[in-house]
Amino acid sequence: MGSEMCIRDSNNIETVLNLLSNCSIETTPNVYAKYGSFTDLVSTKNNIYVTYLPDEDMNKVIDTAKKLKLEGYSVIPHLPARTITNHEELKKYVQALAEDCGCSKILVIGGGGSQKGNITSSIEILETDLLSKYNFKEVGVACHPEGNPDVKKYDLDNAIIQKNQFSRKADFKMYLATQFFFEAKSLKEWELHLNKLNNNLDIHAGIPGPATLKTLISYATSCGIGNSIRFLSKQALNITKLATIRSPDKLIYDLASYQIENPDTKLKKIHFYAFGGIKKTSEWLKTVNKPDLSYNGLKFE
């Protein structure tokens, strides 16, 4: 992909670098435990999201968040509604993140897997006012530009409307954190739809870091992202490409161009899903943030 792509326009260079300068990366407690520390791996300029998967131990999430904060990172733990068993556990988790870890940012999601307790949605968590009580300053809410196979389109739209309504009375900043996608077209079409819903929340666009085409197809399939599966499958018609590392160069360039061409866009930040490994994504970021270098064809001239 894009091996000949060059960015010569100064506006594009500046926009690409701005998008990448304050981007975020996602990790799991197990990945962090594997390295023991991220100080030599990830720039402290990058926010780090800590996942809370359905089978994860809550204390491991808290411990990972605490250690990352001590290393100087701005940490954004996941708060999955359907994984939390009850409101007492919810309070314990939020309180620990705020008081023990020093977190002031959080991502509220519905959560995968079967429901473990009586909390069914992210809006229920927002309406408890626990995030205000424990002084969270920035709260992301999950969203799906290409839809969610487990949720009806009407319900996805209604969730966007509800979260916008809640944001008007919240005393913290809210934003939309997207599921990953592979084409800028997905974001463009989705934002046009959001405009019809009178969305006023900023968008943090989720995209994959460098990974093999085979790995990306696997993740897209497991998440049921139809448009992305079709897009990747076309590239995989040549079986020799399956093991090829696909980096996000062109997607970043296209998103930067979209930002320039649409000054009213709510797209503000990039979030990386490190499907090919956090080391690979971090190395890619460190390289492309140096304007005199190129990496995998992304050239700043």
Language-model features: where?
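Active-site glycine- and acidic-residue-rich loops that bind
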Residues: T85-E88, S114-S121, K152, T178-H193, ...
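Active-site pocket-lining/capping segments in soluble small-molecule metabolic enzymes
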Residues: I25-V31, I109, S122-E146, I161, ...
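Extended serine/threonine-enriched, polar tracts that run as long, contiguous segments within proteins
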Residues: I25-T28, Y175-Q179
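Glycine- and other small-residue-rich loops at beta-strand/loop junctions that grip anionic moieties
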Residues: L53, R82, Q179-F180, P208, ...
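Conserved, mostly hydrophobic/aromatic
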Residues: P77, K163-N164, F172, A205, ...
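Active-site beta->alpha loop and helix N-cap motifs at the rims of alpha/beta catalytic domains
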Residues: R8-F166
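Short, surface-exposed basic-aromatic patches at helix termini and helix-loop junctions that form
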Residues: K67-L70, V94-E99, E191-N200, K286-L293
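Short, small-residue-biased leader/transition segments that mark boundaries at the very start
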Residues: M1-I7
